[in-house]
Amino acid sequence: AGLFIVSDDEEAALGLPAGEYDLPLIIQDRAFDSQNQIVYSVNEMNQMIGFLGDTILVNGAPNAAMDVKASAYRLRLLNGSNSRIYKLAWQDGTPLTVIATDGGLLEAPVTRETLTLAPGERVELWADFSGQTGSEMRLVSLPFSGFSSIGGGMMGGGMMGGGSSLPNGAPLDIVSLNIGEKGADVLPLPTRLSTIERHRVEEAVNQNNPRSFTLAMQGMVHTINDRVFEMDAVAQDEIVRLGDLEIWEFANLEGGGGGGGMMTMDMEMPHPMHIHGVQFQVLSRQPPRGNDSVYQDLSAGFVDDGWKDTVLVMPGEKVQVLVRFENYAGTFLYHCHNLEHEDAGMMRNYKVQG
């Protein structure tokens, strides 16, 4: 995994940290054998829940540590893992300052105690290490309780580990930043970063009838509206018009059977849904019913501001996004960014007609 970094004059005028003070951090989990060769095993469990490695890499390095200066930094984070979700935080409890998400800068910085980052999502942080020479800041992933097991039994509370010694929700060290000599003078973080043209719900062509996509598991495949990927297939309800603004709704109904018997009973899995060729705005979230502690824990770290192309849809949740299909006609993909879910069918084409 790598990054394309796109800039423009508006961004350059902000005076954000640049050069050596602009750090990409690509977070992945992998498994290795005794010869330090990557091991990727595909089995029924991985296919159901997604691959989870037992080693955390940052920019390809395990036990990542970097020397930084006592100055402000721009940290560009990408979750490049197959299926692992991170609940990011500074080890000392310092709030995280978020300045950008998938599609670029936010209108203004926002702060979070924790930051939930699902596969395929990107986020940018502004971090000020000035006056901290000789200290260490560690970016960690805090523990969360994971997701429901199969039937509450067969695989126990740790089933979301898929055989990994690091299940989804395990506490993790991500990267250590060792703060050395004084660096460049710190410019104040602008209170205004960009101007985002907000989509208007009343301009959506389907304002009263959102285009709905039901996410489920049937047997050993993951489906969208009871369909799986076919190379050239586009259903009638997957055709949109160039220039139209639409409401798309992703409904994650996993957790109740799905026709696969014991192997799908009570499976609750999150789905980071990604739409190719567009940037969208998150309109609303309808949380799962009941007192869902996992949802409450992770949703505190959502950043739905700004432009997105990937949104995490939790078990039992419905998420609506506003998306305009502009610039290009043609056939595009939308899919779950859990790579094993995608490979197991949770990917479809949609067509933009001019």
Where are these regions (language model features)?
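Short, hydrophobic beta-strand segments
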Residues: V123-G131, V321-N327
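Hydrophobic beta-strand core residues of beta-sandwich domains
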Residues: D67-V68, L115-L117, G131, E238-L242, ...
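Histidine-centered copper-binding motifs that mark active-site loops
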Residues: A1-W126, S145-G152, G156-M217, V221, ...
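Short, acidic/polar linear motifs in exposed loop/turn regions
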Residues: S81-S83, T133, L253-G256
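Short, surface-exposed secondary-structure boundary micro-motifs
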Residues: D9, R30, L78, D128, ...
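Active-site pocket scaffolds in enzymes
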Residues: T97-P109, N206, P210-G354
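Short beta-strand segments enriched for Tyr within beta-sheet-rich domains
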Residues: Y73, V123, S135-R138, E246
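Short, surface-exposed ligand- or partner-binding patches at beta-edge/loop junctions that are enriched
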Residues: S130-G146, N327-L339
